[in-house]
Amino acid sequence: MKFSVLVAIVPEELEQKVVDNARDLGAGGITILGGRGIGNNTKKTFFGMTYEGSQSVVLMVLEKGLSLEILKAIQELLIDKDKKSHGVVFTFALEHLGGIDLSQLSKFENHLKDSI
């Protein structure tokens, strides 16, 4: 079985939608880290202070096929009606893995069987 790490960097206000969507599609354990983004756009200022906005970094270890399915669903959440993106989502291959809950492995196996 091949695994991928899915990373979604989203505004805090979209964090729960991303988590709920991923869980609905079969994700188990999810790790969320706080962060702040420095993008290409001019920063907002308020009384002389620069506001950069808080970001959530959502991490998931997933079976490779499931990671693509979840990536596509999250991507749809991040694009608004004006076609503007409010985050980024990507995956990368995971070579070695230890400590994953065995019940999660059986969920991944079931997903593989269902997709065949």
Task: Give names to the regions the model predicted.
Residues 1-116:
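Positively charged, small/polar-rich N-terminal and surface patches that mediate targeting and assembly
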